[in-house]
């Protein structure tokens, strides 16, 4: 049985070959940023679950910068970024209310 994806043809034109080279670099950069985004969100969620208000607040501030950067570059849609920030903000504020 054949594998799922057909083998890609190599581009003939120089511009096509250049595009392939660029795509490899861009894909690696996007993958790295996507991973950084998810890690930042997970770290805030872990701090919230642990009940650590100070750490959650600190990590949330750092997470916002990462989320905004990724949204500006178009790796994740800006509405998804806003939604994630809003949901985590609510959790961090609830944690602060419980601790107070």
Swiss-Prot record:
Can you provide one Gene Ontology molecular function annotated for this UniProt record?
small ribosomal subunit rRNA binding
Q: Does the UniProt entry include the keyword rRNA-binding? A: yes
Coiled-coil stretches are none
Share an example GO biological-process annotation for this protein: translation
Q: Which Gene Ontology cellular component terms are annotated?
A: cytosol; small ribosomal subunit
Q: Which UniProt keywords apply?
A: Ribonucleoprotein, Ribosomal protein, RNA-binding, rRNA-binding
The annotated regions of Basic residues compositional bias extend over: 1-20
Q: Which residues cross the membrane?
A: none
Annotated region Disordered: where? Answer: 1-21
- Give the family from UniProt: Belongs to the bacterial ribosomal protein bS20 family.
**Record's function text:** Binds directly to 16S ribosomal RNA.
Q: Which NCBIfam families does this one have?
A: S20 (TIGR00029)
UniProt protein name: Small ribosomal subunit protein bS20
UniProt lists the gene as: rpsT
């Amino acid at each position: 049985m054949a594998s799922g994806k057909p083998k890609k043809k190599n581009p003939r034109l120089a511009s096509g070959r250049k595009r392939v080279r660029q795509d490899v670099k861009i894909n690696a950069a996007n993958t790295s940023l996507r991973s950084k985004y998810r890690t930042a969100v997970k770290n805030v969620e872990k701090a919230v679950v642990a009940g650590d208000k100070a750490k959650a607040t600190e990590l949330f501030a750092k997470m916002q910068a990462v989320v905004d950067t990724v949204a500006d570059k178009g790796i994740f849609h800006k509405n998804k970024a806003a939604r994630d920030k809003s949901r985590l903000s609510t959790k961090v504020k609830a944690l602060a209310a419980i601790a107070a």
